Amino acid sequence: MLNFVYRNRVKLGLPTFFAGMGSLVGGVIVAHYAGFPVGEIVDYFNWIPRGWLPQTIGQFVAFSGSQLILIGLVLMAWSDKPLTWSKAAYFSFLSWLQLTLIFGVLPSEWLNLAQGPLEWTNQREFIKFPPMLFLGNEVSMSFGALKDIIQLGISQGALIAVFVLGYLVQ
């Protein structure tokens, strides 16, 4: 599989790049216009459904498009020749973009979704544990704590994936 991808890297890289551009543009348009209030009439894109779910789907499509763009850019520059300084700088820039998206944008958008439309705050109770588990004390977990646990899982999972990928690349 890897040999096939390497042999056809330009044939695969360019369409992947343009598919990513289309997904990014389409996702941003849907995410932007889905965020408007229900009764507000907007230009040409009034047909886009409103609410947090279409907005989140648009953000997911845009994020997926950004990943396709980066994959396409890597495939187009991938070669079996010795690595030059300029190509190393190019790959390090793409790596920096990827890490910025994963560790900056993705957790931020998750927190915006959880704190905004979903209203996962510390005042809302997610689960109340049985008192017999905690020596008769009442212990509960709020949606705010659940939101932070999910964000921590996203960041830590990505960090572990970066470590494993860095080990495998060497």
Q: Where are the language model's segments positioned?
A:
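Hydrophobic alpha-helical transmembrane segments
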Residues: P54-F63, K128-V162
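Short hydrophobic alpha-helical membrane-anchoring segments
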Residues: V28, H32, I71, L75, ...
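Transmembrane alpha-helical insertion/packing segments
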Residues: M1-L68, L73
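Hydrophobic alpha-helical membrane-insertion segments
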Residues: F18-V28, Y90-L118
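Transmembrane alpha-helices of multi-pass eukaryotic membrane proteins
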Residues: R9-F17, Q59, S86-S92, Q151-S155
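Transmembrane alpha-helical segments in integral membrane proteins
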Residues: G65-K81, A145-Q170
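Membrane-interfacial helical/loop segments at transmembrane boundaries in membrane proteins
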Residues: F36-R50, W110-F143
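Cytoplasmic juxtamembrane interface segments
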Residues: I69-F103
